[in-house]
């Protein structure tokens, strides 16, 4: 979840579904969406304009998100709270006493592993001095309407081990990275993001959109074998 903090007031930009209710309702702050070169959402909260660019890194198990404070008239903080499941894609997780809610130091961030049978997940940022506040807790009953409509289980509990918080100045950006591999420095995070977004094609017509979508079905297995996967969008 992303939260804007200004004048000791918090504005949560997230949107979650729980039984019978959507909370928080961050969609009301969305003013723009762009698909190319990478999915980008623009939020406006009063005098604050925040841009969010989401990027899966090619051939890596890594998600990167760049937040840019486009406009602000007073001191503004950004708070980032990751939610963790650590499960198979065909299962849902529920609150339990076995999950390890601790966070352990990593380069400009932390690493987490709820269960010993899973790999470490590295949560890092590109801005030196970003504070991580440990606050482990379970959030209950996230509801997935499409799963319920298909006759599957559709309620899940998610763990948060804490949140990142930093002050952003007008025009300043911060990159959040979630990866199975640790980034060696804040500079590396910036370089990986820049290189990855530079290789993205601009999806401006039917053919370019079709080529982009087709590439998502081509995967490379750990052993180096390249395959075309069926049903990927539904997983």
Show where each model-derived region lies.
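Acidic, mature catalytic/reactive cores of soluble proteins
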Residues: 1-235
């Amino acid at each position: 979840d992303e939260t804007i903090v200004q004048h000791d007031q918090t504005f949560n930009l997230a949107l979650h579904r729980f039984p019978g209710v959507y909370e928080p309702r961050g969609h009301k702050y969305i003013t723009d969406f762009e698909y190319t070169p990478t999915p980008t959402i623009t939020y406006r909260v009063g005098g604050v304009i925040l841009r969010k660019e989401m990027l899966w890194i090619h051939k890596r198990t890594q998600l990167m998100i760049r937040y840019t404070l486009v406009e602000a008239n007073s001191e503004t903080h950004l708070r980032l709270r990751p939610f963790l499941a650590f499960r198979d894609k065909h299962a849902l997780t529920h609150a339990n006493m076995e999950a390890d809610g601790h966070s352990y130091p990593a380069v400009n961030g932390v690493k987490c592993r709820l269960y010993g049978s899973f790999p470490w997940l590295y949560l890092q940022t590109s801005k030196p001095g970003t504070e991580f506040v440990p606050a482990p807790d379970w959030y209950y009953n996230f509801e997935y309407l499409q799963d319920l409509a298909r006759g599957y289980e559709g309620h899940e509990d998610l763990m948060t081990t804490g949140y990142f918080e930093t002050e952003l100045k007008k025009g300043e950006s911060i990159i959040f990275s979630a990866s199975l591999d640790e980034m060696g420095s804040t500079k590396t995070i910036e370089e990986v993001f820049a290189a990855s977004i530079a290789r993205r094609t601009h999806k401006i017509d039917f053919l370019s959109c079709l080529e982009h979508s087709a590439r998502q079905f081509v995967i490379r297995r750990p052993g180096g074998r390249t395959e075309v996967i069926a049903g990927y969008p539904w997983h």
